[in-house]
Amino acid sequence: MPVAALIREEIEIPGNVSVEVNGSEVVVKSGAKVLKRELAFPGIEIKMENEKVVVESTFPKKNQTAMVGTYRSHIQNMIKGVSEGFEYKLVIRYAHFPMKVTFKGNTVIIDNFLGEKYPRTAKVMEGVTVKVNGEEVIVSGTNKEFVGQTAANIEQATKVKGRDTRIFQDGIYIVEKAGKVL
């Protein structure tokens, strides 16, 4: 089976975004928004060439070939995050006990879930904002992974345990993530 001598991925940089590569650290800026990420893997080189970010590996092994594509996706997500941002939409659903969802500090507080006495909490990751508009919760930010993790934390906080989920459908559910309707 022939093996490629060079795996190379190039990422275009939009005009309103600047990218700096310092060794294995990639810094993406657009206005006041800045994302930094350490992308280090043996045998993979990240560099700037002709206003493009180049991720390459010479005589790669299977895992290095996979990581070149992974790093390309990470850098593309960083560029999209600082230029457009990411947004997840969640909906609040309840049958009998109305839930009250509030955002305070770096936690989301869910009161009266299934009539429970004590509130449930969900951690909000750094750099992520949460807005509650009636029955809708909007999670937004520049880092795709942090926005997704925050939305997952909120959804997991209202997970029903020990009951039939076909009957007890109360909870907060992700309905749209990064522009894709689920």
UniProtKB/Swiss-Prot annotation:
One of its GO terms (cellular component) is cytosolic large ribosomal subunit. PROSITE patterns: RIBOSOMAL_L6_2. Pfam families: Ribosomal_L6 (PF00347). Gene3D superfamilies: Ribosomal protein L6, alpha-beta domain (3.90.930.12). Coiled coil: none annotated. The keyword Ribosomal protein applies. One of its GO terms (molecular function) is rRNA binding. Signal peptide: none annotated. It comes from the Archaea. One of its GO terms (biological process) is cytoplasmic translation. Keywords: Ribonucleoprotein, Ribosomal protein, RNA-binding, rRNA-binding. Belongs to the universal ribosomal protein uL6 family. This protein binds to the 23S rRNA, and is important in its secondary structure. It is located near the subunit interface in the base of the L7/L12 stalk, and near the tRNA binding site of the peptidyltransferase center. Part of the 50S ribosomal subunit. This is Large ribosomal subunit protein uL6. The gene is rpl6.
